[in-house]
Amino acid sequence: MEPSFQLPWNGIHHIALLTADLDATVRFYRDVLGMHTSDIAPSREGRGRHCLIFAKRDDDNVWGFHFFERPIEKTTLGAADAYPQSFVPHVALRLPDGEAARVLRERLSGARVSVTDIPELGSFVFFDNNGLCLEVTWPKGVRGS
């Protein structure tokens, strides 16, 4: 169904999420996933400390994640406990090829992060340190896939 009018959307800029441990979240995304991070900004006006996790470095059109530290209970945001086959809700991340996916899978294994294959999509999912379900996709048929 077509909207009554259209705007020239360029995609999703960032997703804001909560974490109970910002330092652990930065370590996971930087050291395990190899993403770039901003400096941790101090808490002001009740916002809590916060940090940007860049999915694509040096691209102001796409940041990635904006994590805010709050005293929350750690939960499984991906609902895998209640619905083990669904992995919904989740965030899907895109890699350039299958070789990059293989390298990430090895890094996750080295960090003792369990990976579940989604054979019908040719992707895999895992949970970050906050219990957020992340899916990794890449173009099929590209060298290294």
Regions inferred by a protein language model and the residue ranges of each:
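A short, acidic/glycine-rich surface segment
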Residues: 1, 72-79, 144
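Vicinal oxygen chelate
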Residues: 1-8, 11-20, 51-57, 77-145, ...
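Short consensus segments that form the blades of beta-propeller domains
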Residues: 6, 42-43, 81-82
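Alpha-helix termination/capping residues and helix-transition junctions
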Residues: 6-9, 32, 85
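Core segments of cupin and vicinal oxygen chelate
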Residues: 18-63
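Conserved beta-strand in the GNAT
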Residues: 64-68, 135
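Acetyl-CoA-dependent GNAT
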Residues: 68-73, 139-140
